UniProtKB/Swiss-Prot annotation:
Family matches, as SUPFAM superfamilies: C-terminal domain of alpha and beta subunits of F1 ATP synthase, N-terminal domain of alpha and beta subunits of F1 ATP synthase, P-loop containing nucleoside triphosphate hydrolases
Compartment(s): Cell inner membrane
InterPro entries: AAA+_ATPase, ATP-synt_VA_C, ATP_synth_F1_bsu, ATPase_a/bsu_AS, ATPase_alpha/beta_chains, ATPase_F1/V1/A1_a/bsu_N, ATPase_F1/V1/A1_a/bsu_N_sf, ATPase_F1/V1/A1_a/bsu_nucl-bd
GO CC terms in record: plasma membrane; proton-transporting ATP synthase complex
UniProt EC number: 7.1.2.2
UniProt-recorded name of the protein: ATP synthase subunit beta
NCBIfam families in UniProt: atpD (TIGR01039)
UniProt GO molecular function: ATP binding; ATP hydrolysis activity; proton-transporting ATP synthase activity, rotational mechanism
Its job: Produces ATP from ADP in the presence of a proton gradient across the membrane. The catalytic sites are hosted primarily by the beta subunits.
Catalytic class of the enzyme: translocase
Organism annotation: Rhizobium etli (strain CIAT 652)
Principal subcellular localisation of the protein: membrane
Keywords: ATP synthesis, ATP-binding, Cell inner membrane, Cell membrane, CF(1), Hydrogen ion transport, Ion transport, Membrane, Nucleotide-binding, Translocase, Transport
Catalytic activity: ATP + H2O + 4 H(+)(in) = ADP + phosphate + 5 H(+)(out)
Length: 475
């Protein structure tokens, strides 16, 4: 506040929930500039959204506007919201305006970066199609992730979204030495707290941050005003962009991308915009596009984004999820019916898709094996009604063989996770892509027809399955 003399000073003229109008006598602050005011001893940041004329601007509050009064002094910072970036953010939790909220001391970084950035220019972008190997068999084989791509993660409550996210953070750190950024957008505070502690327990982060931490956390929870929820994804993305520009392969998680849209629609009406379909903001596609276009691979590094997507009332044609789909390169669908069988990760091998599963990208062998695996599983699915009514004995020999192979494939798609070691007691496995292809190729070609089903459950490579079969035979 001491610098007020050199900056434009305005006064609050109107407060309507998350939207605050401010009048300036001199020069008006630019759109997206951050304004600061003191709200009962707390720093409140307002972001300029509109110029109303009559020397007035309309702003969105990044925190609760309760306690603000008309005539209160507001200072223009002269720049957009800027947040700390760099290695010091790893293992820490910060809010939308870059303040630490984990009670682990101040966040001192050498650099700060504005949360509104342009997407990288075409000349800076890498157009080479590359796979990001995750070490998770079902993902790498059937719905591979593109390096610098966007992946949609669909799944209900309790099917293992969080565990899958944590395993990806762990594997990317191990296999690629990369960092991860997790943006909690409008999720439950309890879940955010659980994730923070689980990351410390599973070794992904160290308590209080510092050396050995692999993930930075940025939270704007359900109880925050819509301004914070609409901007927290951009704060997380800004932290990720800094790591990318240092040559890192970064994993960027957004949970949940729907809440980003929802927060935008909440402030849209208050800003006086006419709503579009289903009451969403008219700028829905623009808001989404501006954020998604920043997530990309450049010639220096990459940001690969995994976005949990909530589908309102399971309606995939709702404008919010439908707008997200246009940006996705791959989808990972978690299925409750697979989780009920005890197969984890509970990824649906027939519902999950990827545009990287193309012989020109993954190679002929990988493509053929993946398609054979899917057709075997599809056949098993088609025969399940017959099996339920008449039993296995009524099937032809050919169908019996297909069912036996499909059941082995189903079990071989499971694998023990590093982050779940604490609960399961079995050590985690990171499986190389060559081993994954080799194992499934042998399975679909009938090389392992003599091994029992149980040998394929919760193992890494096919060699481990063969070893397990020997132990089972000896027992």
């Amino acid at each position: 506040m001491a610098e007020a003399a050199t900056r434009s000073v305005g006064k609050v003229t109107q407060v309507i929930g998350a939207v605050v109008d401010v009048a300036f006598e001199g020069e008006l602050p630019a759109i997206l500039n951050a304004l600061e005011t003191d709200n009962n001893g707390n720093r409140l940041v307002l972001e300029v959204a509109q110029h109303l004329g009559e020397n007035e601007v309309r702003t969105i509050a990044m925190d609760s506007s309760e306690g603000l009064v008309r005539g209160q002094q507001v200072i223009d910072t002269g720049a957009p919201i800027s947040v700390p970036v760099g290695d010091e953010t790893l293992g820490r939790i910060m809010n939308v305006i870059g303040e630490p909220v984990d009670e682990a001391g101040p966040l001192n970084t050498a650099h700060k970066r504005a949360i509104h950035q342009d997407a990288p220019a075409y000349v800076e972008q890498s157009t080479e199609a590359q796979i990001l190997v995750t070490g998770i068999k079902v993902v790498d084989l059937l719905a591979p992730y593109a390096r610098g791509g966007k992946i949609g993660l669909f799944g209900g409550a309790g099917v293992g979204k969080t565990v899958l996210i944590m395993e990806l953070i762990n594997n990317v750190a191990k296999a690629h030495g990369g960092y991860s950024v997790f943006a909690g957008v409008g999720e439950r505070t309890r879940e955010g707290n659980d994730l923070y502690h689980e990351m410390i327990e599973s070794g992904v982060n160290k308590h209080g941050g510092g050396e050995g931490s692999k993930a930075a956390l940025v939270y704007g929870q359900m109880n925050e005003p819509p301004g914070a929820r609409a901007r927290v994804a951009l704060t997380g993305l800004t932290v990720a962009e800094h790591f990318r520009d240092q040559g890192q392969d970064v994993l960027f998680f957004v949970d949940n991308i729907f809440r980003f849209t929802q927060a935008g629609s909440e402030v849209s009406a208050l800003l006086g915009r006419i709503p579009s379909a289903v009451g969403y903001q008219p700028t829905l596609a623009t808001d989404m596009g501006q954020m998604q276009e920043r997530i990309t691979t450049t010639t220096t590094g990459s940001i690969t984004s995994v976005q949990a997507i909530y589908v309102p009332a399971d309606d995939l044609t709702d404008p919010a999820p439908a707008t997200s789909f246009a940006h996705l390169d791959a989808t990972t669908v978690l299925s409750r019916s697979i989780a009920e069988k005890g197969i984890y990760p509970a990824v649906d091998p027939l519902d999950s898709t990827s545009r990287m599963l193309d012989p020109m990208v993954v190679g002929e062998e990988h493509y053929e094996v993946a398609r054979k695996v899917q057709s075997t599983l599809q056949r098993y699915k088609a025969l399940q009604d017959i099996i339920a009514i008449l039993g296995m004995d009524e099937l032809s020999e050919e169908d019996k063989l297909a069912v036996a192979r499909a059941r082995k494939i189903e079990r071989f798609l499971s694998q023990p996770f590093f982050v779940a070691e604490v609960f399961t007691g079995s050590p985690g496995k990171l499986v190389a892509l060559e081993d994954t292809i080799k194992g499934f190729k042998g399975l679909v070609n009938g090389e392992y027809d003599n091994l029992p089903e149980a040998a394929f459950y919760m193992v890494g490579s096919i060699d481990e399955a063969i070893e397990k079969a020997k132990k089972l035979a000896a027992a």
